[in-house]
């Protein structure tokens, strides 16, 4: 049976997988050409010695197909750039950088920090009636262009349905790495979903009910985004996100004065600590960052990988998926996995982190996935193997590939795909998967509130592991936070007032939530509960 590396998709993951679930494989074209970068990488490994070389040898021995058939390169997307006359506004980063002001010391300084000269932001006001998505709500679409590196990130902005002059602004990020945030828009929390007739359906529980929301396709070559280059680590992607937000708020200062939050799921557990840290590192900025929210995230692998066996074997609140022998095999593999992750944490070297990712994903995620059970929802089987277990993802992709849809939003690529598995491999083979980005969270907690929430039916980024890493995190409030018990989280208003929707613990700027009856994508499975906690979080209830 062929075993392949993991993928956090939608923010969800597909680890070691037999043919019946989505796996990582070679592109249909150019396989021979794309295999060369990995061969070159393996040649470089011959210069290593000691533990690093031993780890690579061990991984290659256990999982030869991983090493032989997974390139670290991605093909550029076919695209046709629209003329500047198509866009309503083009914000030049060089113009933003050219603005100087007098600082408190009386010396001249830039109005806004950051290296923005190479960036432009293209903006088009989208006609909601053209697509029937949230008619009456102001919308903008466009691209952030990095002209030096030929990178072009697509975004779609929806104004708040309620009070856009005062409601906060939220950036939403799906995970992967390599999955489009437009999946989150149409499958989870956006103003419309797509039905089996490939038609948009109004979402009463959209997150833009009381907030303006930006959905961003990042990194490049994801969704409607494209590039001739590649981004293969989270830190590089953070520079692009800072540039996009800076130029967007420069064009729309009416939103810049409002509170801003970053939310996302799954691999956004990597993205968000980095992106928020990047924003906060710029003292002179026009981004009013107030908090971050991470749903069913992968943030601290060393802690979280402890909880795959318990979740799969009946200790997470749902019946066991695996038999005793499989559970024992996961127990047997865990010490070696943790040792490899510790080495990755200690060195942050790609040579150490890559084999840790491959070994641990195959050893601890593989047994579960080979059962055919949905890795994103422990309650059922994988229903649609061609669309990451969800038929709805296929509907979304079909809709976004319609010519009239691409024309209406100004998309420049010839086609849309929900997830780009080349990007996933790029991140994995650059060691990004296992790197300890959770170490940035204490710095965030010094300045802003952090919410970690988790649907309790998810396997891949399960609530047990997310709760555990928040309790293990070293920060000044750890002694007070860690021992706190979970308390009931209930709906406060409407006809369902008093209904239990989950559990919560909170101290200082740190909050953890368990959401009942939801898998990896909480807003899709529990739309009312997700909007309830989202609105209350933005309202500052727990900070």
Swiss-Prot record:
The keyword RNA-binding does not apply. It comes from the Eukaryota. Its main location: other. Disulfide bonds join 179-419, 313-327, 337-360, 344-353, 382-389. InterPro entries: AB_hydrolase_fold, Peptidase_S10, Propeptide_carboxypepY, Ser_caboxypep_ser_AS. Glycans are attached at residues 210, 509. It holds the Pfam family Peptidase_S10. Vacuolar carboxypeptidase involved in degradation of small peptides. Digests preferentially peptides containing an aliphatic or hydrophobic residue in P1' position, as well as methionine, leucine or phenylalanine in P1 position of ester substrate. This is Carboxypeptidase Y homolog A. The lineage of its organism: Eukaryota, Fungi, Dikarya, Ascomycota, Pezizomycotina. The gene is cpyA.
């Amino acid at each position: 049976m062929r075993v392949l590396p993991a993928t956090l998709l939608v923010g969800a993951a597909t680890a070691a997988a037999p043919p019946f679930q989505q796996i990582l494989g070679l592109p249909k074209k150019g396989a021979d050409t794309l295999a060369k970068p990995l061969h070159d990488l393996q040649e470089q490994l011959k210069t290593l010695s000691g533990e690093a070389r031993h780890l690579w040898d061990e991984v290659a021995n256990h999982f030869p197909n991983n090493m032989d058939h997974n390139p670290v390169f991605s093909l550029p997307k076919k695209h046709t750039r629209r003329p500047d006359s198509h866009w309503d506004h083009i914000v030049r980063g060089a113009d933003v950088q050219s603005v100087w002001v007098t600082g408190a010391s009386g010396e001249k300084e830039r109005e806004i920090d950051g290296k923005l000269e190479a960036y432009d932001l293209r903006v088009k006001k989208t006609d909601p009636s053209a697509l029937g998505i949230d008619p009456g709500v102001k919308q903008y679409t466009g691209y952030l262009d990095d002209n030096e590196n030929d990178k072009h990130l697509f975004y779609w902005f929806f104004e708040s349905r309620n009070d856009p002059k005062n409601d906060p602004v939220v950036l939403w990020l799906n995970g992967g790495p390599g999955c489009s945030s437009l999946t989150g828009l149409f499958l989870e929390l956006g103003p419309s979903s797509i039905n089996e007739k490939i038609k948009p359906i109004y979402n009463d529980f959209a997150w833009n009910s009381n907030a303006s929301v930006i959905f961003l396709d990042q990194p490049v070559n994801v969704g409607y985004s494209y590039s001739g280059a590649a981004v293969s680590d989270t830190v590089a992607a953070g520079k692009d996100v800072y540039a996009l937000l800076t130029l967007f708020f420069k064009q729309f200062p009416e939103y810049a004065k409002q509170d801003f939050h970053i939310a996302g799921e799954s691999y956004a557990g990597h993205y968000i600590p980095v992106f928020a840290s990047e924003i906060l590192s710029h003292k002179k900025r026009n981004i009013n960052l107030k908090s971050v929210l991470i749903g069913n995230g992968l943030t601290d692998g060393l802690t979280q990988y402890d909880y795959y066996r318990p979740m799969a074997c009946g200790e997470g609140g749902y019946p066991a998926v695996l038999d005793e022998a499989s559970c024992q095999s996961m127990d047997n593999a865990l010490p070696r996995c943790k040792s490899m992750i510790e080495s990755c944490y200690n060195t942050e070297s790609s040579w150490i982190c890559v084999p840790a990712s491959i070994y641990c994903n195959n050893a601890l995620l593989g047994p579960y996935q080979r059962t055919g059970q949905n890795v994103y929802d422990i309650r059922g089987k994988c229903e649609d193997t061609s669309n990451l277990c969800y038929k709805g993802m296929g509907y979304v992709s079909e809709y976004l590939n319609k010519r009239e849809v691409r024309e209406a939003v100004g998309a420049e690529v010839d086609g849309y795909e929900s997830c780009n598995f080349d990007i996933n491999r790029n991140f994995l083979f650059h060691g990004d998967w296992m790197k300890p980005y959770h170490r940035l969270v204490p710095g965030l907690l010094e300045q802003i509130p952090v919410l970690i929430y988790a649907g309790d039916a998810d396997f891949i980024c399960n609530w047990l592991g997310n709760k555990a890493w928040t309790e293990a995190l070293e920060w000044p409030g750890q002694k007070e936070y860690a021992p706190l018990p979970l308390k009931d989280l209930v709906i406060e208003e409407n006809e369902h007032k008093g209904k239990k929707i989950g559990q919560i613990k909170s101290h200082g700027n740190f909050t953890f939530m368990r959401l009942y009856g939801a898998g990896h994508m909480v807003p899709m499975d529990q739309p009312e509960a997700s909007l309830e906690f989202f609105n209350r979080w933005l309202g500052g209830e727990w900070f």
